[in-house]
């Protein structure tokens, strides 16, 4: 008999079918379906597949006495109650490294689109406007890029920035060994120095509103911020206020605090480029995350352990 798996996130039919080759899948991607599935099948669930945004609460873990493994499909796991899981002997794993390149590509795409004003240039062109009537947008090559969170995704972003001859700085809790990029102990100092910030730090309570009014205004009226991390890291109200007041040049956001609803206060701002939390999604990267989940699950069930533990 196949182990019972509770799937809490939306996935394509092909991906669900691939997982269903190995597990009895209970697919519950909405809140109502989730609550009903745990109430009805909680006694049987051995594995949960979720993601960082959707998470898994301590109460839900307690309602599944046979639960052995909680997996986040991507790298983020900020809303999984890891302490509650460990207290009950539940292993926790994620998909670290599976979509780093895709996220970094998207981050740089947002940077280029925002700084160069590509979406608004596209709209103007479709409306018959020629270049002589359009204000010039700044370039990217040779500028100073500050990366907030130089983890595996941050390193991929830095590699792409090097191809644009950018000066690269980063802010972490501590310097990263073996890295020659300029380290900033204080984020404010990096914002003062940088032309652009790309936010690639984990979400959660420790980084909530890390990029606030002070940081945005330090970046300045010619500065731009890109967020491909978690919406909670950037103070949306402060971001809107800074752009409207001319204290920040613009922003490219794949994530925002109002998800899945778009950030209402930013929708009329042409200096803002928005995408629907899709930076890590491509056919290749999604397949890699599913493959990693299956690796983790097989390792756990075989007694050899997960490949990418949290």
Question: What annotation goes with each model-predicted range?
Answer:
Residues 88, 95-144, 156-159, 163, ...:
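Phosphate-binding beta-alpha-beta segment of Rossmann-like dinucleotide-binding domains, i.e.
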Residues 28-29, 73-74, 90-101, 172, ...:
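Short beta->alpha connector loops at strand-helix junctions that form conserved
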Residues 1-93, 212-217:
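An N-terminal-biased, well-structured beta-alpha scaffold segment characteristic
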Residues 150-151:
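Glycine-rich Rossmann-fold phosphate-binding loop(s) that bind the pyrophosphate
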Residues 21-28, 89-90, 179-187, 269-273:
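Active-site regions of enzymes building and remodeling cell-envelope glycoconjugates
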Residues 46-47, 69, 196, 224, ...:
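Short, Asp-centered acidic motifs that coordinate Mg2+ and/or phosphate
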Residues 56-58, 173-265:
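Rossmann-like adenosine-cofactor binding region
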Residues 2, 86, 93-105, 259-310:
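C-terminal helix-to-coil terminal segments
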């Amino acid at each position: 008999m196949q182990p019972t798996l509770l799937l809490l996130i939306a996935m394509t039919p092909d991906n669900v079918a691939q997982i269903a080759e190995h597990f009895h899948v209970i697919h519950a991607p909405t809140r109502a379906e989730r609550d009903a599935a745990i109430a009805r099948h909680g006694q049987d669930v051995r594995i949960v597949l979720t993601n960082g945004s959707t998470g898994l609460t301590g109460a839900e873990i307690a309602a599944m006495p046979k639960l052995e493994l909680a997996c986040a499909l991507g790298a983020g796991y900020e809303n999984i109650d890891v302490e509650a899981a460990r207290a009950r002997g539940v292993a926790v794993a994620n998909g670290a490294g599976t979509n780093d390149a895709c996220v970094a590509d998207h981050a740089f795409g947002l940077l280029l689109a925002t700084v160069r004003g590509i979406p608004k240039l596209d709209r103007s062109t479709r409306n018959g406007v020629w270049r002589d009537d359009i204000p010039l947008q700044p370039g990217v090559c040779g500028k100073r890029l500050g990366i907030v969170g130089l983890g595996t995704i941050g390193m991929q972003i830095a590699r792409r920035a090097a191809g644009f001859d950018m000066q690269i700085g980063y802010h972490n809790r501590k310097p990263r060994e073996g890295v020659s990029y300029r380290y900033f102990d204080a984020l404010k100092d990096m914002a003062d120095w940088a032309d652009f910030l790309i936010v690639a730090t984990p979400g959660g309570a420790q980084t909530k509103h890390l990029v606030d009014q002070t940081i945005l205004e330090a970046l300045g009226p010619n500065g731009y911020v890109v967020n491909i991390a978690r919406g909670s890291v950037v103070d949306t109200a402060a971001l809107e206020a800074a752009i409207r007041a001319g204290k920040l040049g613009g922003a490219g956001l794949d994530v925002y605090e109002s998800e899945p609803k778009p950030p209402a206060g930013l929708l009329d701002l042409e200096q803002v480029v928005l995408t629907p939390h899709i930076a890590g999604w491509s056919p290749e990267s999604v397949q890699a995350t599913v493959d990693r989940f299956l690796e983790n699950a097989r390792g756990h069930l075989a007694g050899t352990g997960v490949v990418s533990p949290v």
